[in-house]
Curated annotation (Swiss-Prot):
The chain crosses the membrane at residues 65-85, 99-119, 131-151, 162-182, 192-212, 221-241, 263-283, 293-313, 336-356, 369-389, 392-412, 425-445, 455-475, 533-553. PROSITE patterns: MFS (PS50850). The keyword Cell membrane applies. Residues 28-41 have a biased composition (Basic and acidic residues). It is found in: Cell membrane. Induction: Expression is positively regulated by the azaphilone pigments (MonAzPs) gene cluster-specific transcription regulator pigB. It holds the Pfam family MFS_1. As colorants, MonAzPs are widely used in various food products for centuries. Moreover, MonAzPs also possess wide-ranging biological activities such as antibacterial activity, preventing hypertension, lowering cholesterol levels, causing hypolipidemic effects, and displaying antiobesity and antitumor activities. The lineage of its organism: Eukaryota, Fungi, Dikarya, Ascomycota, Pezizomycotina. It comes from Monascus ruber (Mold). This is MFS-type transporter pigP. It is a multi-pass membrane protein. GO terms for cellular component: plasma membrane. MFS-type transporter; part of the gene cluster that mediates the biosynthesis of azaphilone pigments (MonAzPs), very widely used as food colorant. Disruption phenotype: Does not affect the production of azaphilone pigments (MonAzPs).
Length: 570
């Protein structure tokens, strides 16, 4: 758990050689975690470079500020885009008369993004990091433009899918850029800074969306990305972003696409992911879980995924998701930990507003304000924990502490009732957010500090996929738990109220359909059902603590390569 084995080092050298055959792999017969290579002239062993490989020094000063500002704004916009549409959806469905399409406004983005994420790792591994990142962001902006000018519901769905394709490579690219710009001990602080500010987009999305919808038009929920995108373009266009690993030279783009991106693996993986996520989307909503459609989607996803695994095994280290990498304990535990943490975040982000709107009776805008304590404490701890990891070197204690505090915070949410005081729901949320913030970036730091540079983009892509996969799965489980619990609890606390009428009415309109004498019972049933959903989040938080133990005890300060010399290109 503490250090990389000799076998892993040999695997790393082989994978580096296969990924970049024109490069001489480093000599791996050494002690410790940092690979070494022998100089051609004097035979002196030197640390293998894990920073810029294009002769530039680490990025500092105003150039680093410009790069960090640019990628943070991009990640902020991406997370804003996932939540801003929620308050605009009623107005959109009214204009397009498209109530049956509501689910597709979110799932079109998710399906496109999740199916492309693993491929983005190979793209960043083989193409210029800066222009790959800018290209993904440009596709995201194109999707936003299509949504803004949409003349029909179908056009809006297509725009959301295009935006999802662009969004698939944004977070991966941001972490890859940070890895190439600064030395090891500075990465945790910058990663925490990026995640802390970017995640504000999740909470202010409904506020901004509600304001646009009420005072201008819902189209500005998408137009807002365009002027900010222009600012990002100016910040990044004139700044040189160093490469963390050498990219293939003298090889045509067509050759890279055909030989290095593992398109067959992508063609197998994408439909497997789409079928699985569609089954989760349809199950219990459009179709029953035991319907032929849902069962067929699950079976199709399973069969296609088996074919994908066999192909990846055949491809070996050239695969889209190399088997030898996923077998590394640090990698797969980091993926699982990040997935469970994101599941707790998404469950709370969806069901805390339901608690405030349905049970406390506030509007959508105010419910967004009421969940600020968890998001602000999460952002603050993300920044603080990242800085302290960079200062003291160890990420594992923060991940373990984050799992414990997040478990306690989610556990306290299960005590919510219609009469829970303001002080309690603020304090509980602060604790919950602090736990998430302390641990959220630790899987990324662990992967970056336990893998050779050529594998970092692939690992980041895998972690980002787990974010979508675990999030979608847990939200589907949460929906099943909430709906079934609400039916049962309504029979217990409000037996005279038909359960289906409450479910169909929705979280904000059921009060108008319930007799005054039955409302307290309905509110209690709603509250108990939300509590049961938070039990699911408790389980996910406990799992983050358990799997964090496999991420390794490592001092990242001892993994510092010498700073390259040379003039920085701009």
């Amino acid at each position: 758990m503490a250090s990389t084995s000799n076998t892993d080092r040999v695997i790393d050298a082989g994978m580096i050689k296969k990924a970049h055959p024109e490069q001489t792999p480093p000599d791996v017969s050494h002690e410790g975690d940092v690979a070494t290579e022998k100089g051609d002239s004097d035979g002196v062993e030197q640390a293998a470079p894990t920073g810029p490989t294009d002769g530039t020094p680490w990025v500092t000063g105003i150039k680093l500020v410009m790069i960090m500002s640019g990628i943070t704004l991009v990640c902020f916009l991406m997370l804003l885009d996932t939540s801003i549409i929620s308050t605009a959806t009623p107005r959109i469905t009214s204009q397009f008369h498209s109530l049956p399409d509501v689910g597709w406004y979110g799932s079109a983005y998710l399906l496109a993004s999740a199916s492309l994420v693993p491929l983005t790792g190979k793209i960043y591994q083989n193409f210029n990091t800066k222009w790959s990142f800018v290209s993904f962001f440009a596709v995201f902006e194109l999707g936003s433009l299509l949504c803004g000018v949409a003349t029909s519901s179908k056009m809006l769905i297509v725009g959301r899918a295009v935006a999802g394709m662009g969004g698939s490579g944004i977070q991966n690219g941001a972490f890859t850029i940070i890895a190439g710009c600064v030395p090891m001990q500075r990465r945790p602080a910058l990663t925490g800074l990026l995640m802390g500010f970017a995640q504000l987009g999740i909470v202010i999305g409904p506020l901004i969306g509600g304001a646009f919808t009420q005072y201008t038009t819902w189209r500005w929920c998408f137009y807002i990305n365009l002027p900010i995108g222009a600012v990002v373009g100016l910040l990044l266009f004139f700044v040189h972003i160093p490469e963390q690993l050498p990219k293939p030279k003298g090889i045509s783009v067509v050759h890279i696409i055909l030989r290095k991106l593992d398109l067959v693996g992508f063609v197998l993986f994408a439909p497997a992911a789409v079928q699985f996520l569609l089954a989760l989307q349809y199950g219990g909503n459009k179709y029953a879980w035991n319907s032929s459609v849902v069962i067929g989607l699950f079976c199709g996803a399973g069969a296609t995924f088996v074919c994908f695994i066999l192909w990846e095994w055949y491809k070996g280290d050239d695969a889209m998701i190399p088997y030898s990498m996923i077998c590394r304990q640090t990698v797969w535990t980091s993926c699982v930990v990040y997935g469970f943490l994101m599941a707790t975040l998404l469950v709370a982000s969806y069901y805390l507003p339901i608690y405030f709107q349905a049970i406390k009776g506030v509007n959508a805008m105010l419910s967004g304000v009421y969940i600020l304590p968890s998001i602000l404490s999460q952002s603050a701890l993300a920044i603080i924990s990242g800085a302290l990891v960079g200062r003291f070197g160890y990420y594992l204690p923060w991940s373990l502490a984050g799992g414990i505090v997040s478990s306690v915070g989610n556990g306290l949410l299960t005590t919510f009732t219609p009469s829970t005081s303001v002080g309690k729901w603020i304090g509980y949320q602060i604790l919950l957010g602090a736990g998430r913030g302390a641990g959220l970036q630790m899987p990324i730091i662990a992967a970056q500090n336990n893998l050779p540079p050529p594998l970092i983009p692939v690992a980041m892509a895998l972690i980002m996929f787990c974010q979508s996969f675990f999030g979608s799965t847990f939200l589907s489980y949460a929906d099943v738990i909430f709906t079934n619990s609400l039916r049962n609890k309504l029979k217990e606390y409000a037996p005279e109220v038909p359960p289906e009428s409450i479910i169909v009415a929705g979280a904000t309109a059921f009060r108008k359909a319930v007799p005054a004498d039955q409302l307290p019972g309905v509110l209690k049933a709603y509250s108990k059902s939300v509590d049961y959903v938070f039990y699911l989040a408790v389980g996910a938080a406990v799992a983050t603590f358990v799997f964090s133990c496999g991420m390794g005890w490592k001092d990242i300060r001892g993994n510092e390569p010498p700073q390259p010399s040379g003039d920085e290109k701009v």
